[in-house]
């Protein structure tokens, strides 16, 4: 039965918030009420920021990162090593590695992992651009910084096998990443240790 305090506008706001990661119906309701209660201090600036993001944030044509420019600030930074590419599942993992401040090369965002359950195959990932970069740029090493989940490791093996046809060293994160672990949930120290202890494949 529909609640007597139900309102279409509020219901829509709660529904949209509930679609964000980490939000369920109750937490979405609390967030919606907090926004409404603090309309001028929070809701209006948030709406303006969202509109600005829609207009200005783009996906980097080279690595798949997001920025206000394409190519992004990482790809165009002359101070970074152009000989290493760190392959990550998603942008959150890229950010986690950047926070660790131990990697000074380039990145490549796959946009997911291979997954039979979710019907995600090689053609669904950003693999062709990775191969194009290796063939077109002077890349010495590709570091596979993928999650230690079943799908993550399956993807790592597939990418390593694909890259074995090219003259590039392929390595993966070493100790420090627990089985089933995902990068964006790990602290900077753990990520730094895993990157420093990377192993050749």
Which positions does each model-derived feature cover?
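Long C-terminal interaction/binding lobes of large macromolecular proteins
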Residues: 39, 131-201
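Catalytic cores of large soluble enzymes that bind and process phosphate-bearing ligands
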Residues: 5, 38, 42, 118-122, ...
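Conserved, well-folded catalytic cores of nucleic-acid-processing
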Residues: 16, 20, 38, 53, ...
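Extended interfacial segments that mediate partner engagement and assembly in macromolecular machines
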Residues: 28, 77-143
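Cys/His-rich Zn2+-binding cysteine-cluster or related metal-binding knuckle/ribbon modules and their
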Residues: 3-10, 19, 31-94
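Solvent-exposed alpha-helical segments within well-ordered globular domains of core cellular machineries
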Residues: 11-15, 29-33, 44, 48, ...
